[in-house]
């Protein structure tokens, strides 16, 4: 269990058990290293990532307090829509053909038709189930972001920023687009990825955001570069206010790469701080 592993590794004073609807989840809180914090950054990890993931999540949550921002890194639920078995057809038993050899040929055609009809129904069931589970996933994730915002407010955070990494950036963008919560002032996407079959796509979501947004991506990957270009073009078409992009190059040394990312995030959060 990833949460149990984190509980053993992370200092107890950083661990917070937050309540979201009917479930509790682990969040990691680090207060800003100043008497006058600028606010709190809520960090949303991507699929398969923990609240202290070594890429982006952990380094940012550890470094942001030195930039006068508290950090609150949350864990996301296991998504139902990721665990769908597509072979629903097998759940429906096909009619048995007669065992007598002479009549097999006459019964083959209606059996094939029946099996074909069942496959179409099964495909529709899979599509409907996927949509239902995707909505359920979104509600569970939104409840966790709600709980994180409430906790940051309890800690008297003057300003609240949401930062999403990987698919966490997609879910955070969905949350901010659908909820349009007044408590969140800024949004940062890092290496944004959309989950498989995600609707709406990320390029349709980002132009709907009504708050300053930084889209940080890695230019080394052609697919990511193309997706970032789509997001920029969509934002220009809708004249999205305060949408900016930052292109980074991947560095061979992970520590240097994480420091580069932190400097870009810090520079956007604290414009007066020299890079």
Description of each model-found segment:
Residues 83-155:
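Alpha/beta-hydrolase active-site loop
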Residues 51-58:
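The serine-hydrolase catalytic nucleophile loop
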Residues 37-46:
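Short beta-strand element of the alpha/beta-hydrolase
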Residues 181, 185-252:
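The feature captures the conserved acid-bearing segment of alpha/beta-hydrolase catalytic domains
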Residues 162-173:
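Gly/Ala-rich beta-loop-alpha elbow adjacent to hydrolase catalytic centers
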Residues 1-32:
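N-terminal cap/lid segment of alpha/beta-hydrolase-fold proteins
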Residues 241-275:
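C-terminal catalytic histidine-bearing segment of alpha/beta-hydrolase fold enzymes
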Residues 61-85, 90-91:
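Conserved alpha/beta-hydrolase
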């Amino acid at each position: 269990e990833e949460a149990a592993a984190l509980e053993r590794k992370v200092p107890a004073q950083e661990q917070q058990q937050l309540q979201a609807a009917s479930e509790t989840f682990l969040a990691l809180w680090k207060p800003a290293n100043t008497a006058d914090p600028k606010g709190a950054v809520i960090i949303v990890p991507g699929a398969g990532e923990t609240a202290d993931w070594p890429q982006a999540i952990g380094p940012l949550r550890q470094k942001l307090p030195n930039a006068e921002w508290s950090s609150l890194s949350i864990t996301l639920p296991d998504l139902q829509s990721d665990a769908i078995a597509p072979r629903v057809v097998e759940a429906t038993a096909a009619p048995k053909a007669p065992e007598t050899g002479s009549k097999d040929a006459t019964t083959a055609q209606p059996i094939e038709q029946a099996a074909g009809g069942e496959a179409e129904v099964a495909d529709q069931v899979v599509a409907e189930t996927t949509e239902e589970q995707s909505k359920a996933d979104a509600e569970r994730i939104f409840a966790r972001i709600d709980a994180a915002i409430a906790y940051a407010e309890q800690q008297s955070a003057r300003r609240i920023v949401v930062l999403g990494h990987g698919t966490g950036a997609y879910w955070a963008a969905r949350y901010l687009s659908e909820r349009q919560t007044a408590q969140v002032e800024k949004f940062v996407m890092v290496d944004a990825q959309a989950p498989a079959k995600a609707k709406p796509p990320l390029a349709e979501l980002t132009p709907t955001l009504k708050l300053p947004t930084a889209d940080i991506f890695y230019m080394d990957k052609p697919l990511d570069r193309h997706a970032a270009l789509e997001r920029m073009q969509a934002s220009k078409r809708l004249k999205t206010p305060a949408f900016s992009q930052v292109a980074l190059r991947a560095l061979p040394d992970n520590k240097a790469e994480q420091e580069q990312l932190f400097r870009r995030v810090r520079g956007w959060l604290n414009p007066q701080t020299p890079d």
